[in-house]
Regions:
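A generic structural signal for alpha->beta connector loops
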Residues: 24-26, 70, 125
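N-terminal Rossmann-like dinucleotide/flavin-binding domain of flavoprotein oxidoreductases
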Residues: 39-98
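N-terminal Rossmann-like FAD-binding beta1-loop-alpha1 element of flavoenzymes
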Residues: 3-28
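FAD-binding core/adjacent interface of flavoenzyme oxidoreductases
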Residues: 1-5, 35, 73-130
Length: 130
């Protein structure tokens, strides 16, 4: 059983993982990627201390920082969550696995609504941003 299961690996999820791991709690982060919406951002200019950085670079730096601690990354989608009779959280994954944890933090973030126009996907992060 894991102390903390975190759904989402964007800035909030990675920060939660860092804080929990530094307190010597066992941590699992469940996501389909590391970085979330940052990965689709060409340039970030409002992150304190890093005035000009690409979303990919910032996600990479955050990932490296978190990986200095024993955090288990689980690359899967989440189908559902529930609480069992003992108060533990069950996280059902799209690969059929079920994770069990004492605490659940949901930082699923969001995905932008796309316009579905020609060139949108190929230029996302390179001129097209949301």
């Amino acid at each position: 059983m894991t102390d903390v299961i975190i759904i989402g690996a964007g800035p909030a999820g990675l920060n939660a993982a860092l804080y929990a791991a530094r307190k010597e709690l066992s941590v699992q982060v469940v996501s389909t990627d590391i970085g979330g919406q940052m990965l689709l951002t060409g340039e970030i200019e409002n992150y304190l201390g890093l005035p000009h950085i690409s979303g990919f670079e910032l996600a990479d730096k955050m990932e490296a920082h978190v990986k200095e601690y024993p955090v288990d990354f689980v690359f899967a989608g989440v189908l559902s969550t529930e609480k069992d009779s003992e108060g533990h959280f069950l996280v059902h994954l799209d690969d059929g696995k079920v994770l069990t944890g004492r605490t659940l933090i949901v930082t699923a973030g969001k995905r932008s609504r796309t316009l579905d126009i020609p060139g949108e996907m190929e230029y996302t992060g390179r001129g097209v941003s949301y």
